[in-house]
Structures are given as C-alpha cells and as structure tokens.
Amino acid sequence: MLKITSADKYFSLCVREQAKFTCERCGTFAPPELSKRLDCSHFHGRGKWSVRFDPDNATALCMGCHLYVTAHPIEHMAFIQEKLGPYRFQALAERAQDMARGRQARREVKEIGKHYRQQLEFVRQGQPLEGYL
C-alpha cells in the first residue's frame, strides 16, 4: 500500500471537484459530504511517480466504475483514449515512462501538495486543473 501524502489528498480532491463530484464514466453524483464514494482513479497506477499527479492520468470514478475498469483493462484504456484523444493519450504514455520526471515528483512532493492545495481554490472557481510538472 502506498503512503497517501498531502499531495495525493489535494490532487484527488481537485480531480473530484473538477468533475463536480460526478463519475466521469456513468454520471453518478456523489455530493462532497459523500465524496468517499467517488475515487480518483489513476490510469497508470499511483506507483508510477512520473504521472502520479498528472491530471491526464486521473479520472473521477464511482466505486463501481473504478472496480469495473480495474478488472477490465482494455475497456479502461479505451475509456481513457476517448477522454483524452489520441495525441494526449500518447503524450501521457510517454510521460509515464519518463524516469527523470518521476524522480522530480518524489523530490518535490511537498511542493506538489502546496500546488494542488492552491489549485483546489481555482478549480472551485471553475478554472481548469493545471498540473505541476
């Protein structure tokens, strides 16, 4: 089990807030007070530090959809490809393999947490989520 950092907490909240606490796959609404029913799902798992805090790598999914896409990786890939489009999907795959980017994220995890804490206010004002790296 990976340790949940402040950066993870604020990044996850930003992803769910940007989705208006609605599952991006099935449309189920999970109000903020029930936000534990909505996960921040990573296409490339959280262990892949190079894209752990990358908005293109994260989707707000209800628990049911999160379990489903985890059990059906081909459908998960198709869902993410449709969401991002071919160019952004390929760019995400390339960033996922960038080891220097992963090392940077590990070194700067506290700064990443501060960044997403600030981003949360912008997202709540309707602005798009901006990544850190």
Regions found by a protein language model. Give the residues of each.
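Short flanking/linker segments adjacent to small metal-binding domains or redox-active Cys/His motifs
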Residues: 90-133
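Short microdomains enriched in Cys/His and/or Lys/Arg
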Residues: 44-57, 81-96
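Histidine-centered nuclease catalytic patch
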Residues: 24-59
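Amphipathic alpha-helical interface surfaces
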Residues: 11, 19, 36-39, 54-61, ...
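Short, charged surface segments at domain edges that flank catalytic/cofactor-binding sites
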Residues: 1-22, 102-106
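Conserved aromatic-histidine-acidic binding/catalytic patches
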Residues: 3, 7, 50, 68
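Short Cys/His-centered divalent metal-binding micro-motifs
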Residues: 28-31, 58-84
